[in-house]
Amino acid sequence: MTSSLVGSEMCIRDRYLGTPVDALNHALVRIRGSYALAVMFKDYPGEIYAARKDSPMIIGVTGGESYLASDVPAILKYTRNVYYIGNMELARLTKGAVAFYNLDGEEIQKEMKTIEWDAEAAEKSGYEHFMLKEIHEQPKVIKDTINSVLTDGNISFESVGLSDEDMKNIQQVYIVACGSAYHVGMVAQYVIEELTSLSVRVELASEFRYRQMKLAKNSLAIIISQSGETADSLAALRLCKEKGVKTLGIVNVVGSSIAREADNVFYTLAGPEISVATTKAYSCQLVAAYLLAMQFAKARGEISDERFAQLVEEINTIPEKIEKILEDKERLQWFASKVVNIKDAFFIGRGIDYAVGMEGSLKLKEISYIHSEAYAAGELKHGPISLIEDGTVVFSVVTQSALYEKTISNMVEVKSRGAKLFGLTAYGNYAMEDVADFTVYTPRIDNLFAASLSVVPLQLLSYYVSVGKGYDVDKPRNLAKSVTVE
């Protein structure tokens, strides 16, 4: 027995005393779960070995230097030349060079990619925080995203790889995402269903991937993720592909896992987003969803030329209208100073406004640590209204003209129970001032695109509340920019 044990130990010892690549390959096939590893061997100075499975990893190279990171922004100020390491692959980094290997230890070739982002985009450029800078960048990046597929009044998804024929054949749309991207999906659902005859389901990726549901034939799964590395969203994408469902990724990071694995990709052009709480990436995802909905309607013959042209004109006004909102941010800063010490907050709205309220609520809780909940306004009477007491702050988003009076009636209900009301609506709806204690107006725009404007005051409000409380706006506690764990 002793001899056998020693023999086994010697066998393992010899196996792991091969090259570092051999040693790592033998170890990796025995590891379960997801990982991104960087390993150094004392007998191989000046070398770093890297491997990943289901977790993001990129490698940057410039001159005599090599960099290993989980995301592009981390190395952007050093280099824009990157390699993407695949699942269950190894990399050996030396000064200014990198080699890749498969699990058989064979060297494989990879193409170096150049990131087009400007390195200055990863700097604060005079702003106090990245979040404030990124809020102010929204007009430009939204315009860039629109112009990437919209030219001379026509939308072309040639770069996305989704043809009009593909759109005609789609019978069901699933939108799968997490966090703020899920709120984008909720807005997209309303817009797609209003413009087309398609049925749309919006699912949380962390729930979708575990459900035993039958996915419809000729369906499209839209996976929304800023980083393109969100673990649950990536798992949901793989599930859809296993079931034969066509997949489309809406992502911001070129070459990310979702971008590589999805059948089609719509890249948002938000540039690097450093602040953990998303603002400009969210807004670019919104306009990407609008453009998809518009082209679905046109390709399927479900929208008139006049209505399509009207929407094209309206979507092109979003950047300049956001500029106007940003010019009046001092009023929001003043209001934020009045609510900086509240313990609870509630957001209400109907339809698209409810989806915006969910995003506003998430922003407030993310960076100011105030307990905040969003409710569909019509659900208040089914329980949440019992939480309203004297002084409770309720934020009401009221931009949908067909739902205006209904939501105003809900505001009256909570005010009669002592709530302090923040009203957010479009210019012209001045009756809001008869109900709300503080009112913010946004420029008028087609109801379908209202979320792009109404979310901006809520972003600013959350920012100023967090600053007023003295918190680290860009790096809120317990949160990460790219959620790569399940």
Locate each region found by the language model.
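Active-site phosphate/pyrophosphate-binding segments
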Residues: H26-V29, Q138-I142, I146-Y174, N264-V393, ...
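Single conserved hydrophobic/aromatic residue that forms the stacking wall/gate
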Residues: M1-I12
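Generic C-terminus detector
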Residues: G105, K420, V435, I445-E486
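Catalytic P-loop NTP-binding/switch module of NTPases
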Residues: V98-K168
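Glycine-rich phosphate-binding loops that contact phosphosugars or nucleotide phosphates
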Residues: S3, K168-Q310, E314-T317, V397-P443, ...
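Conserved catalytic micro-motifs used in adenylation/nucleotidyl-transfer and phosphoryl/amide-
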Residues: H26-P73, Y78-Y83, M88-L90
